[in-house]
């Protein structure tokens, strides 16, 4: 267990150094930030004797429904489940706590986590409101796939972007459900224009899947399950090292890596080291020569080959001397 990983995105390269110990996969956590604790416990539980597990391992996909208050998160679950399991009213924040709702669809069971939504800091006056924010983050932590519900009549707000950022930093599968689509006047360009606005605002997660829905009419809600299945498949996909390096060789041949002061970046090979999200380590001659634009180019080539729709991809650069 590697503690003090307070920023997963920045510190993961350091975590992977612990592979050199040869005693298994390092588990990153932050005791202070309460990050990664669930994953650590999951690993511990895997080693419990089988006869002590009465219910077995819970492999049901966990879906966090998140968004700012009163965008229709609970209404979406109610429509999908077919009953009022979560009390809803038009007053923002009537869902006070995270509630797990199991749903069976086409023979597969899903667990939906509904939350009270994130509040603007200026409106937080009680500890209860602060607690609901913590629960939103906790729901994202527990989830395999995050469904961010936004209001079609408002577009992506600053708060929506903040919630999306939380899910992105934690490498969760991402679906954006644009609710209240029935309230929008439409022409043949409406979906395209809304899609472009959303992608421009959330440019840090171009991989996110979009779905235009209406909790009021039920429009397209039945497509959510297929989209969830697709995103989970992307999150757990493993690519053989040999296949990855065929793509890498072709990509390098088409566009040379960057150089600086006469020294060119060399990528010796790459391998996938993790899922949820899919994480790749690239062994290079000099990390200082790597550039995010070239990493994005490699990422795009991998996505062209395998899709990886709805999930972030992580890339770690590690130096390796040529003689090695």
Predicted regions and their residues:
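A short amphipathic beta-strand at an alpha->beta junction
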Residues: 307-322
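Inter-motif core of Ras-like GTPase G domains
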Residues: 126-153, 162-177
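Short, non-transmembrane amphipathic alpha-helical segments
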Residues: 198, 294-308
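Long, well-ordered amphipathic alpha-helical subdomains in the mid-to-C-terminal portions
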Residues: 64, 227-232, 236-290, 296
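Conserved G1/Walker A P-loop phosphate-binding module
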Residues: 17-20, 43-145
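Conserved nucleotide-binding/hydrolysis micro-motifs of P-loop NTPases
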Residues: 5-9, 32-36, 92-94, 117-119, ...
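Flexible beta-alpha connector loops of hexameric P-loop NTPases
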Residues: 86, 118-132, 182-190, 236-237, ...
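Canonical P-loop GTPase G-domain recognition
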Residues: 5-62, 173-175, 182-242, 312-314
């Amino acid at each position: 267990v590697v503690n003090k990983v307070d920023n997963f995105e920045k510190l993961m390269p350091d975590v992977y150094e612990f592979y050199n110990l040869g005693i298994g996969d390092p588990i990153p956590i932050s005791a202070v930030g309460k990050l990664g604790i669930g994953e650590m416990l999951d690993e511990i539980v895997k080693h419990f004797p089988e006869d002590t597990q009465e219910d077995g391992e819970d492999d049901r996909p966990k879906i966090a429904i998140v968004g700012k208050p009163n965008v229709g998160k609970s209404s979406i679950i109610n429509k999908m489940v077919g009953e009022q399991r979560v009390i809803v009213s038009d007053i923002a924040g009537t869902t006070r706590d995270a509630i797990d709702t199991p749903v069976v669809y086409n023979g597969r069971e899903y667990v939906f986590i509904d939350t009270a939504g994130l509040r603007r800091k200026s409106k937080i006056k009680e500890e209860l409101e602060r607690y609901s924010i913590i629960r939103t983050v906790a729901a994202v932590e527990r989830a395999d796939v995050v469904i961010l519900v936004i209001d079609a009549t408002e577009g992506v707000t600053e708060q929506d972007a903040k919630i999306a950022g939380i899910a992105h930093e934690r490498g969760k599968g991402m679906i954006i459900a644009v609710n209240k689509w029935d309230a929008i006047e439409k022409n043949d360009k409406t979906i395209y224009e809304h899609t472009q606005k959303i992608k421009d605002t959330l440019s840090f997660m171009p991989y996110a899947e979009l779905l235009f829905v209406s909790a009021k009419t039920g429009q397209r809600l039945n497509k959510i399950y297929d989209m969830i299945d697709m995103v989970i498949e992307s999150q757990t996909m493993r690519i053989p090292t040999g296949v990855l390096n065929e793509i890498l060789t072709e990509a390098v041949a088409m566009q040379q890596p960057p150089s600086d002061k006469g020294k060119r970046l060399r990528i010796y090979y790459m391998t996938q080291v993790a899922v949820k999200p899919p994480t790749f380590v690239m062994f290079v001659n000099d990390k200082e020569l790597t550039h995010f634009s070239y990493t994005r180019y490699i990422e795009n080539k991998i996505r062209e080959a395998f899709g990886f729709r709805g999930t972030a991809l992580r890339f770690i650069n590690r130096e390796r001397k040529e003689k090695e």
